Amino acid sequence: MHIIKIFGAYPWQVEVEPESHDHITATKRNEFSYTAINGAIDEVERRVKSSIQKDNPDAQFSIFYSRLRATSGNFVLDSIRERMSKAYAVIFDITGFNKNVMLELGIALELQRHLEKPAKVFLISCAEQFEPSLLPSDLSGYFLSCYQINEKDNTVCFKDGNSLVMRMTSDIMEILKQPYREELEKNTQAHA
């Protein structure tokens, strides 16, 4: 079975007690970031499974998705770096340029310079809250896909024709073809 690991990095919202502006009562995920990333990954998995099972009905493939977070008891950055080094991709929601998300993005960009097969970096942002002039120039060449929030039913859709889904589907299809190419090359060399 082929398992493709993808992590998502997005801001968490802090809830503060109304009477006391400094007492944090809870943190919770940003539901729109969560919905955008999960929706894209579900669609990628559906498309890839449909495509590979046309050629090979017995083919098994799965996407393992988790939010990017540290493991309890470990130094936070080491844990995040380790997860990124084992992933196919990390999707960063840079809406609002959250400091933790931007720090994690910096780690991913540094790993791209030092790993043989670094995780692909995909950036997403809520279109209504994204200000292109605030995007650091060093990120201008990276893939960025904006999503919109339908406030009537709290759904999320990407406004760029699903380019994130198409790009990830294409990349994963190439990855899944690679073991078959390597096997074919071995068989060809053995018979030469």
Predicted regions and their residues:
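Short beta-strand/turn micro-motifs composed of small residues
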Residues: 10-12, 123-127
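TIR-domain catalytic/interaction hotspot
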Residues: 67-110, 162-165
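Conserved N-terminal substructure of TIR/SEFIR domains
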Residues: 1-72, 82-84
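Arginine/glycine-rich "motif VI" loop of SF2 helicases in the C-terminal RecA-like domain
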Residues: 109-119
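Conserved beta-strand termini and adjacent loop/short-helix elements that scaffold enzyme active sites
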Residues: 64-68, 124, 147-149
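Hydrophobic/aromatic beta-strand patches that form the interior of the parallel beta-sheet core
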Residues: 91, 120-124, 145
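Short, glycine/polar-rich helix-capping loops at beta-to-alpha or helix-loop-helix junctions
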Residues: 128-138
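C-terminal interaction surface of TIR/SEFIR-family domains
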Residues: 137-192
